[in-house]
Amino acid sequence: MLSSRQYGLSDVLRALEESRKLADADRSTDQGLLGPFYNDLGMGYFQLQLFPLAVEAFLQALPLCRQPSEQATVLQNLGMTHNVLGNYWEAQEFHQKAASLHGSVGQRWEQGRSFSGLAFSLSQLGDHRAAWDSYLHALQAAQDTGDVKGQWQACEGLGAAAARLGQHDQALKYYKEALALCQHEPSSVRERLVAKLADAMRTFVAQEKIAQARFLPSAPGKLQTSRKAKTSARVQSSAEDAQESQWEGEASEGGHEKKEMEGLVNTATVLGPQRQNRATTHLPSGGPSPSGEEYPFIIAPKKLRVSRSSTWAKEALGRNFQRTRIQSGLCSIM
């Protein structure tokens, strides 16, 4: 119904609300079926950008899901939705739990996406060192599973985190890697990365000039001292301009990065073996929020698609992960 042009927004909303009322009223229904139902309901609200209603539906689904993989999917959906809403404290808690649960059942691909969502939450909270660590975990998971999109998104996040930490050589390295990996993405993605790479290069060169100016050999006489001081001042000004340009670029990352958030939000398929043949697609990476902002490292969904996956991130990392994808059947925002 959501993908059909035969129905308007009011028709879809009416159908969702009627379905919800029926489920709320009929508690005789098998609890194992209600979990997937409320999760799907949340996915419907998410696609309509009714994010508070999506959170409410996902919270109803969580205690009704019996399998760790299903619980992990709902936790990940909650984390992604809270990221879109700007509730980063709540988002990072849900993503941590989801990453641990995905790891406990060998869902390495899904775990990588949870780490990316967690890293974004941490970066928005200003904890760039922790964000760096989570992006590294996301990159490793993406490499383990051959997830090229996950790899360049993690590299882009690592570049931004490195810049915030003052590690401009690392920022250059990861932006270059991200650009090399995203050749099949839309031109807007490549243009964004080129702009970030250029800003990182300007900042790096300016910082190098400052470092060199500090070690210039001193010469006698006031004239030499004056020239050295002027040179140092010019270099410092150049570095500050480059740094300011980079921060402006990363401020718009709240636009560009928040756009990617709707780039991590993939919709997954279904819950339960009886629904495994359901077709799946996902929205193009990026997209505006109701306020006009864009979300980086989320992918706004167009249809539904699956994932499955229990404890915390550190415990999960110590496990041996399966390289084959295990599907839970629950619709998830990736």
Curated annotation (Swiss-Prot):
InterPro entries: TPR-like_helical_dom_sf, TPR_2, TPR_24, TPR_rpt. TPR repeats lie at residues 35-68, 72-105, 112-145, 152-185. Disulfide bonds: none annotated. Residues 233-246 have a biased composition (Polar residues). This is Tetratricopeptide repeat protein 24. Transmembrane segments: none annotated. Keywords: Repeat, TPR repeat. The keyword Repeat applies. Residues 220-258 are annotated as: Disordered. Pfam families: TPR_2 (PF07719). It comes from Mus musculus. The keyword Transmembrane helix does not apply.
